[in-house]
């Protein structure tokens, strides 16, 4: 039986985190939630998830910095980072990609689109 894919949800809004957890677990993913940037970074280094869903406006450490640090480390640089945020400006999107994000989606979002993007990012061809 194949190993369940693990997704780290870095989201400080509990309702959004719970919604993501619910839908991802229904799709067969194992999930962990981090409510601030420092916790997200630590959990990423400790658990090495298969994907990180990353909000930008996180307490303690901004999502751009979390992404930059994950992509700079040899132990986590292969992990796809999917930014999911209300920051919808072109400047924020460009900065997210510059920091190493593999995808960027704005809130509010459509769950079917989010799940399709996650499935694409988790395909072997999108790995390291």
Where in the sequence are the language-model features?
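Charged docking surfaces used in two-component/phosphorelay signaling
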Residues: 18-26
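Acidic, metal-coordinating helix/loop segments flanking the phosphotransfer/catalytic sites
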Residues: 33-51
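Conserved acidic carboxylate
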Residues: 11
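C-terminal output helix
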Residues: 109-119
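The feature encodes the CheY-like receiver
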Residues: 17, 59, 77, 89, ...
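Active-site residues of response regulator receiver
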Residues: 55, 85
